Amino acid sequence: MIKQITERFTPRQYLAEFLLGLTALFGLYLIVAWSSYTPLDNSWATVSAYGNTINKVGSFGAWIIDLFFVFLGYVAHIIPFTAFLVPIYLLKTKAVKQLSCTRIILR
């Protein structure tokens, strides 16, 4: 039984699952930053007279979300949810076994 379990998971698959988990956590961080975004924060493109950061995740969250909004426009609203939901989907469907570096680069 133990031999069957160890044959299924390789170190590369463990690393892939770990990185997907970190990506999902970063996506959750971006969702919180996106939901508490306000133009009154001191961020990448704006300077505010209000000294405190209103964003719930701090000045870095305000900065990164504002950077997304400036460079990507309305598409920036999709990025936090995609960064959270795609890794969760890949982990739930066990698609990690089929992932390879060349597939990720080509997609």
From Swiss-Prot:
The chain crosses the membrane at residues 14-34, 68-88. It comes from the Bacteria. Pfam families: FtsK_4TM. This is Uncharacterized protein HI_1595. The keyword Ligase does not apply. It is found in: Cell membrane. The keyword NAD does not apply. It comes from Haemophilus influenzae (strain ATCC 51907 / DSM 11121 / KW20 / Rd). Its main location: membrane. Keywords: Cell membrane, Membrane, Transmembrane, Transmembrane helix. GO terms for cellular component: plasma membrane. InterPro entries: FtsK_4TM. It is a multi-pass membrane protein.
